[in-house]
C-alpha cells in the first residue's frame, strides 16, 4: 500500500482587496501518496497557483492543517521547513527564472551544487535528450526560445529527484509536440523514480495523466 507523503486538511486562504475579503481557498483538502500524480484544473485566477505555493510551503495559510512526510508544517520552525523543502520538494513555475549568466546545463546543475551533491551530468544529459534539448546544453537562456527555457526549468526541478514535484502549468508555453514530450517525461520520472507529482493545467489532455483529477472552482476543490 502506497504511503501518504502529503496531506492537507481544510486549508483556508484569503486576501483583502481594500476592505473586501477574497476567499481564494475554502476547506481545501487533498492527499498525495507515493508514486501518484494529481492534476488540478480551473480557470485563470481561481487559486491554482496559490494552492501549489501553500502545499509546497512557499506561502502561509490562514487555517487548516498541512503535513508533508508526516511533519505538521505549522508545528515546525522556518529553518526546518526550509530543510524539508530542500530535501523533498521540486518546483516548476509558470515563470522559469533561469539565470542569464549560466548555460542551460549550468542552470540545471545549480540545485546539485547548492546541496553539495556530486554533479550528475549523465542524468542531466539523459533528461536533455528526452526533451530534445541535447544541442542546447551549452546555450545561454537568451539564446533559447520560451518553450526551451520552460523545458530546462523542468529538468532543473527534477535533477535531484525530489519526492514531490509541484508543476504550475508546465505545458503552458509549449506547442503540442513538446507538450507531449514533457508529459512523457513526467510519466517516466513518476514510474522510474517514484516521484509524486501535483500539477495545475488548463489543458484537458494534460489533466488526463492524473491518477486523481480535481477542479478548483470558487475556492473549493472538486473531483
Model-inferred region functions:
Residues 41-43:
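The feature captures the beta-strand-to-loop junction immediately N-terminal to the Walker
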Residues 56:
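Helix-to-loop junction immediately C-terminal to a conserved catalytic motif
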Residues 64-75:
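Conserved ABC transporter NBD signature motif
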Residues 102-109:
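Short coil-to-helix segment of the ABC ATPase nucleotide-binding domain corresponding to the Q-loop/switch region
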Residues 140-150:
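Conserved ABC ATPase signature
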Residues 159-163:
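A short, proline-enriched helix->beta-strand linker immediately N-terminal to the Walker B motif
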Residues 165-168:
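Catalytic Walker B motif of ABC-type/P-loop ATPase nucleotide-binding domains
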Amino acid at each position: 500500500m502506497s504511503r501518504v507523503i502529503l496531506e492537507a486538511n481544510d486549508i483556508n486562504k484569503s486576501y483583502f482587496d481594500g476592505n473586501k475579503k477574497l476567499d481564494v481557498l475554502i476547506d481545501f483538502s487533498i492527499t498525495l501518496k507515493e508514486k501518484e500524480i494529481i492534476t488540478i484544473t480551473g480557470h485563470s485566477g481561481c487559486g491554482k497557483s496559490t494552492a501549489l505555493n501553500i502545499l509546497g510551503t512557499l506561502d502561509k495559510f490562514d487555517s487548516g492543517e498541512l503535513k508533508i512526510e508526516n511533519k505538521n508544517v505549522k508545528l515546525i520552525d522556518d529553518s526546518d521547513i526550509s530543510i524539508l523543502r530542500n530535501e523533498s520538494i521540486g518546483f516548476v513555475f509558470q515563470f522559469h527564472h533561469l539565470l542569464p549568466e549560466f548555460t542551460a546545463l549550468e542552470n540545471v546543475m545549480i540545485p546539485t551544487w547548492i546541496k553539495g551533491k556530486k554533479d550528475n551530468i549523465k542524468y542531466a544529459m539523459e533528461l536533455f535528450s528526452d526533451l530534445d534539448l541535447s544541442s542546447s546544453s551549452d546555450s545561454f537562456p537568451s539564446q533559447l526560445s520560451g518553450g526551451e527555457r520552460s523545458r530546462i526549468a523542468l529538468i532543473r526541478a527534477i535533477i535531484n529527484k525530489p519526492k514531490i514535484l509541484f508543476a504550475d502549468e508546465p505545458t503552458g508555453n509549449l506547442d503540442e509536440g513538446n507538450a507531449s514530450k514533457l508529459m512523457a517525461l513526467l510519466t517516466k520520472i513518476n514510474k522510474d523514480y517514484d516521484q509524486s507529482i501535483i500539477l495545475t493545467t488548463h489543458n484537458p489532455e494534460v489533466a488526463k495523466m492524473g491518477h486523481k483529477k480535481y477542479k478548483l472552482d470558487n475556492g473549493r476543490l472538486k473531483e
